[in-house]
Amino acid sequence: GKVLQITFCVVILFSCAFFTLLYWNDNKYKNDPNEGIRYLYDNWEFYYGALLTPQDLKNGDTKGAYMEYVTIGEVNNYSNHNPYRGAHGCGTYVLHLKLAAEKTRYAIEIPEIYSAYRFYVNDELIGQCGEPGESDRNYQEGIQTKIYSFEAAGECTLLLETRDESHYYSGMTYPPALGEESVVLHRV
């Protein structure tokens, strides 16, 4: 009787201590692995049928394309549910961000974009995957997830010139993830 009661109390105490330790150190609701990561899925400007550079936008030259707002992940091709638009071709995605006032080193994970792109931060070409080309004749597919690092402060513009002529999907179908460089690299 008495030994069983003592054993029961010891098991309860160790269990409480163990679960408290798990709560503080391994709680999926407390320690969010994505803390510090911002998924960039909404408020993207999209220009269908045009590959626009930062300079084009500064000059107000959209090459005849009109701007519409899109949410990344809502559709999986350029048609954007418009029956009069093709699912393939090209388009430019633009996102304006307000970042920390002091210059900070950021990293952005760009998931696979179908099927080629050039990526600019403000006016600087940061990276490229495949070759969007100026037409479907000099386009080269290059589909892969990449991480790019850059420094920025305050107002920041992300721009992706994209083209797809060959895949089932087209354009940006998954949102990029942005955060301070150490946070993004630690997550991956």
Residue ranges, per PLM feature:
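Extended carbohydrate-recognition surfaces in non-catalytic/accessory domains of CAZymes
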Residues: 1-7, 15-102
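Intrinsic-disorder/low-complexity, polar/charged segments enriched in Ser/Thr/Lys/Arg/Asp/Glu/Gln
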Residues: 39, 90-96, 103-107, 143-147, ...
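Short polybasic amphipathic segments
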Residues: 43-46, 50, 117-119, 176-178
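Solvent-exposed beta-strand/loop surfaces of large extracellular or lumenal domains
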Residues: 62-73, 80, 124-144
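Soluble extramembrane domains flanking the early transmembrane region of eukaryotic membrane proteins
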Residues: 89-92, 101-105, 112, 128, ...
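Aromatic-lined ligand-binding clefts that engage carbohydrates, nucleic acids, or primary amines
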Residues: 97-99, 104-122, 158-162
